[in-house]
């Protein structure tokens, strides 16, 4: 069983069932429970060229409102697959629950899930995305994506920050933390407290030159705390 909470609008969202024998059922629940109409279509992918964009005129759309159950009893094998599409005139939230069972056992319309089933979802832009066994994207072609793992693969809401975090190993994070500590302690904190070395310390810690001309300038702060300079004037 595979459940997906998603948002639909005028751009069709598609889900594909492959390498599985029917029947399977699809429960569509409008969230929250409203009766606003939406349209769905189920078609054999043999009738659609997946290497090019499908058009509405080639698909038989059915209008529905509220919650509904859609039952398909056809055979789905290695050479045949089904495509479930759903869209709405206005943007709304829906829950899609796809369930199926291998035909080697007795099935009902309320079939249970099968471990061998594979589902897929396309992006609203119909960009093709392919995933390997670790759900890593390794292919970028034209339209539909295929998932090699169970359940629905939908990478639309994946945060870009989480993608960055996943690419960093523990050692890399330690190195980043060490660099941040070095910059704070040696480059910022040390300069803030000053030092006797005029090349790294504060400008007010430069040695006072004991010449008459120095009286025409503002005395540095170090003068106030240096006994030698206090007595020199």
Swiss-Prot record:
Region span, Disordered: 102-132
Predominant subcellular localization, coarse grouping: membrane
Residues that span the membrane, as ranges: 168-188
Keywords, comma-separated and alphabetical: Glycoprotein, Membrane, Transmembrane, Transmembrane helix
Low complexity bias spans: 102-124
Compartments in which it is found: Membrane
Membrane topology: Single-pass membrane protein
Protein known as: Uncharacterized protein ORF149
Organism: Trichoplusia ni ascovirus 2c (TnAV-2c)
